[in-house]
Amino acid sequence: MSVRLPSSMSYGEEEEPDVLQKMWEKSKQQPFVPLGSLLTAGAVLLAARSMKRGEKLKTQRYFRYRIGFQLATLVALVGGGFYYGTETSEHKQIREDKLREKAKQREKLWIEELERRDSIIQARKQRLEESKKELRELAKQGFIEEKESNDEKED
């Protein structure tokens, strides 16, 4: 019989957000950063297209747009970092509190699981001892009966 050891993972645990969910949340916090990134990428694509067509003036204009969009994206990123910097420390404290609470919950579940398994083991040991006791009594009775039957045969 295979017995699984108790896991330190809680069963009702919510999953950590994946990369796309994290990106979506950060994009909602700082919407100008992804917008600037998209505009920069668009400017580079337009510059590449105009370069392929041989339109030098449009190519230069699109590369200048790219520089402007990159600057705006960088300003939005730094500004958002300063703005959300204090809020981030508050979020960090809240997250640490949640992690501590989750660790306490896991420890509690772990202890409950170990106690449950220990009670099962103790019950099995008790049943084993009772079975051994019954077998000894049956063996003793059988031995006594055999002895009595041997004594009767000898008489």
Swiss-Prot record:
Q: Which PROSITE patterns match?
A: HIG1 (PS51503)
> In what way does this protein cross or attach to the membrane?
Multi-pass membrane protein
Residue span(s) of domain HIG1: 4-95
What sections of the protein cross the membrane?
32-49, 62-84
**UniProt keyword terms in alphabetical order:** Coiled coil, Membrane, Mitochondrion, Transmembrane, Transmembrane helix
User: According to its UniProt record, what is one Pfam family this protein matches?
Assistant: HIG_1_N
Please give the GO cellular component terms listed in this UniProt entry: mitochondrial membrane
An example Gene Ontology biological process: mitochondrial respirasome assembly
Q: What is the annotated localization of this protein?
A: Mitochondrion membrane
InterPro entries the UniProt entry points to: Hypoxia_induced_domain (IPR007667), RCF1 (IPR050355)
Coiled-coil regions listed: 111-142
Q: What does this protein do?
A: Cytochrome c oxidase subunit which plays a role in assembly of respiratory supercomplexes.
- Which family does the entry's similarity section mention? Belongs to the RCF1 family.
What is its quaternary makeup? Associates with the respiratory chain complex III/complex IV supercomplex.
The record's annotation in PANTHER family points to: HIG1 DOMAIN FAMILY MEMBER 1A (PTHR12297:SF3), HYPOXIA-INDUCBILE GENE 1 HIG1 -RELATED (PTHR12297)
Q: What is this protein called?
A: Respiratory supercomplex factor 1, mitochondrial
